[in-house]
Amino acid sequence: VITLLVVAKVKKIPAPVLLDLAGMGVIIGQCIGRWGNFMNREAHGAVTEAFLKMGLQDAAGVVTYYHPTFLYESVWNLIGFIGLHLFSKKRKFDGEVFLLYVAWYGLGRAWIEGLRTDSLYLFSTGIRVSQLVAIVSFLAAAGILAWVLLKKKPAPDALYVNRKPAEPEAADGKDTDD
């Protein structure tokens, strides 16, 4: 986050513009990264006999089937990435794509975390820390989205991409910023 703010300041680009780009990269990174949980045989859900299940063999050769939460989250994030990509050209304000990412990820993470067996709990309560953070993230992002769209009513010409004129390319074809 600090690097993003420094880059925004140095390049004179509004931070929400960079957050929109970061959100797209992070969600596809999470989609791919969850497969590391599969390779490590970790972060799976509870024992299940559901249609989608992942078999893990213990040292004695006994196979137990678990919810493949890595797969659920990977598919959830892939759907989110596709949705954000399609939506990104229709956004009404800078930062909207990032807020949608946070809301989407929070919603999915709250659901998927409920299936996992290796969760960290808040003190001695039955509240999972990741679920709490996910729900708060979803509510905050959805609240900010609603507030901006209903109260501020942003216009498409307010988007940074629509305000900044295209920079001319140098005669040799190289970027003029170098």
Language-model-detected regions and their locations in the chain:
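A feature for loop-to-transmembrane-helix boundaries and adjacent hydrophobic helices
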Residues: 1-178
